[in-house]
């Protein structure tokens, strides 16, 4: 190795061989019932007198389904084959993945609970595995998760959310970003086995992985080696 090359390696580190080769498609889910509700005047996150509407594990709206079909057209054209398709176990991500990647050749697909959204609101509380098994393809491998797989919280969980009325515990930043660090490692572990990995997830998750704000059904195409060593942290 030349002195110049050695200096670069010592300065920035040498990417893992799998990281440098594996493409990573990051996708945010389509528009949901909670997205619609939060867009109303005075209903947004942190609004005075905020009250959670108790929309549990929200589904895609007709607009969200249309966005997922548009995603499908793009995937069929630009990425007609994906080695591994991962999705958060929340309904909006699973539905986006099933619509958005229909007809795309996927060697393997599975749910990735590390990619669930940070538990802000009722919409981020998951559905029992037995319910998901009735609604989505068995190819996801739901049997690998416990019945109640989502963040539970307890009376010791500190409240970090803006003043308001909530119907579920909020996932504190320490817990969430520790989970995001494990997700980064899990994605890197996939790199040596697959050429293209797709992950369908959520705003908070994708922001932690990239530092960017993703719109509904927006996606990015990058390398696993582009992932940060530690998650990007957004202010509460």
Region locations from a protein language model:
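Acidic, low-complexity terminal tails and accessory targeting/binding regions
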Residues: 7-15, 19-27, 33-37, 42, ...
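Short glycine/proline- and acidic residue-enriched helix-loop micro-motifs
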Residues: 50-58, 140-172
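A short, structured active-site edge motif that brings together acidic residues
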Residues: 84, 89, 106-125, 146-150
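Bacterial N-terminal signal peptides that target proteins for export
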Residues: 1-6
